[in-house]
Amino acid sequence: MNKQIEERFTTYLQTAGYTEKTIKSKTRQAVLFNQWCKKRGTSPEAIDYKSCLKYIEYLKGKGNSKKTINHKLTHLRNYFTYLVIESYRLDNPIENTIIRGEKTQSYYTLLTRDELEDLYYSFETDKVLHDNAYNKMAAKRDKIVVGLLVYQGLDTKDFRGLRLEHLKLNQGKLYVPSRRRSNARTLELKPWQMMEFMEYVNTVRPVLFRKVKNPVDYQQLFPYGEQFTLISVLIKKLKKYNHKVTSAKQIRASVIIHWLAQHNLRTVQYMAGHKHICSTEKYVQDDLESLHDMVDNFHPIS
C-alpha cells in the first residue's frame, strides 16, 4: 500500500471521528487488501466487483466466519469511499455488499407485516376503560403513536424530541430530529395517519396538554411531564392484541427487516436514522444463498 495513501486514509478516518483502535483495524484491513490485490496483478484503484467477490471467497477460505467477513467488508467500504473522495476511483464496488446468512443475535420474536398492521387497525379508540372525554382523547393519541411505531419505525427516544413544527401535514411528512446516536430524517406519513394527525393537533392534543403537570416543552408533539412513560404503557396494551409483542425495540426491528426486503441498505439506513451502515447491516437475517452459490450463480468465476 502506498505510504502516502495510507497516511491520508488515516487522516480521513481521524477526521471522521473514529477511535485510534478502530483506525488501526481499518488501516490494517486496507493494507492486507492491497497486498492481496498486488499478488493478483490488480489494485484497489482498479479492481472490479467480480474480483472483490474473489477476495470474499479468499477470506472464506481462510476460515473467517460470515460475521468476521462482514466486519472486514465494513472496513473496506470505508477505504473505497476514501478512494472515491480522493478521485482514485469513480465508484465503491462493495457499497451494498454483505454476506447474507449471518444471524444477528436477536432476542426478539419478529412480527410479520400483517401482525404489525393488525396492531394499528385493531387498536380501540372508542371502547375505552372509564369511558370519559380524556380517556377517549388519550386512546386516539395512542393509536397515532402505534402508527408511528408500525409505519415509520420510530425509536422510543425519537418521540421525546418531536415538536409540533416537525409535523409537516401540508407535505404529508414527519421530520425526526437527530439524537446523539441517530441521524435526522424526514419520513412519509400514510394518508390515514395525516387525517388522524389533523384531528390530533386541533382537538386531541389541547385536551391532553391540560392534564400534563410541568410539561417539558409547550411545543411537544406528544406532551409529557417529568417522566416519559407513554411507550411503556402502550406496549402493555399492545400485548393484549398480540401476545408476541414484547417491546418497542421488537416492533422497530421487525419494521426495519421488512424495509430491507423492499429497499436497498442506504435507503433503510436513512429511514431508520442509523449513523453508520453497519448498524443497518445487523438487521439482515435472511438465510439466502451461501457465498459460494452467490458467486457461482450470479458472478461465474473460472
Question: Whereabouts are the PLM-identified features?
Answer:
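Conserved catalytic core of the tyrosine transesterase superfamily
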Residues: 1-302
